[in-house]
Amino acid sequence: RYTQSEQTLDIDFTKPFDVGLYEPLFVATGFQYRNESYESFAGDTASYEIGPLATQGFGIGSNGFPGLAANSQGRVSRNNIALYIDAEAYITENFMLAGALRYEDFSDFGDTTKGKIAFRWQALENIAFRGAFSTGFKAPTLGQSNVRNVTTAFGTGGELIDRATLPPTDPVSQLKGGEQLTPEESESITFGVVADFDNGLFITADYYNIELTDRISTASGIALT
């Protein structure tokens, strides 16, 4: 079995400032500390040892899902801290501007700073335009970096085969070119229009363009011979 736990401490502050704009500048800032742990536990010995039906082509374990072997169990953990600041204000009666910055430092992936800028313009009494540009960062979870499991399935010729999901740092993965996972990063652009009519009709239309790099997923099947 697998368990993943997380403990988080957040400290947040918000305050409006009168800086001579149409409305006060609202500022939010804060700090976050997060600790994550991932632990895998070995199954019953009979669930992963070779059984008496191995000579008939059956894999180890029962129901096609072998238990986790004792040499595969373990515990990993990491922590990260984050600092952020977010500001928003109506520059004029009809134009709102917002911006945000977030800094994070991971014990296993280093640090990064990402941001966002957004606006809303009330062009007419019942029509407004809005848009935003932001950058994103997502570190692999401890489960994604360390999960292991094996299932038994039928191959293309009807034979029984074992299919394994292995972490990229496993010797078998490295033999086939596996490397340590890297964080996902993204850039996002949005633009939209909002129309609110007196007869109760409310219309929104938004365009989204999200570019994601280093997306994390399982590899296609790799045969071992």
Residue locations for each model-derived region?
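Outer-membrane beta-barrel channels and translocator barrels
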Residues: D18-Y22, T92-N94, Q122-N126, S186, ...
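Outer-membrane beta-barrel transmembrane domain signature of Gram-negative proteins
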Residues: R1-M96
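Residues on the lipid-exposed face of transmembrane beta-strands in outer-membrane beta-barrel proteins
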Residues: I11-K15, L83-A89, I117-W121, G131, ...
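Residues that define the transmembrane beta-barrel architecture of outer-membrane proteins
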Residues: T3-L9, S77-I81, D111-T113, L175, ...
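Transmembrane beta-strands of outer-membrane beta-barrel pores
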Residues: F17, Y33-E39, I81, L101-S107, ...
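Outer-membrane beta-barrel signature, preferentially recognizing the C-terminal barrel domain
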Residues: S72-R78, N126, F137-T204
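Transmembrane beta-strands of outer-membrane beta-barrel proteins
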Residues: L25-T29, L97-G99, G115, F129-G131, ...
